């Protein structure tokens, strides 16, 4: 058995943000537009991504993005009101309904898209705190 992976020499958006601190509006618009198209495609195939963050978005040699790490994705989500009570995701990117242990659906991906846009323009997630309890309260 062989595992073939695409090499992305330009790294991920987490690395790019660490280097640049934030993106200009034009670059943020391009990246967000491509992530939006990727999410639309996933949702059309009934996939809820659930772990959208800069570290899970790779850059290719032409400046376009690729989503990676589908480990937290949920298949066969055919409704925006899918009942999933799983507590999954990265702390600074968790949607309020996940923290409240409520059922959630594909809408958590759209929440994460907003968090991502904020981070691209400001340089950190909107409710970021080093203390986990404070972070959760802010969300």
Each predicted region: which residue ranges?
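Catalytic-loop of the protein kinase fold
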Residues: 43-59
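Conserved activation segment of eukaryotic-like protein kinases, specifically the C-terminal portion
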Residues: 84-94
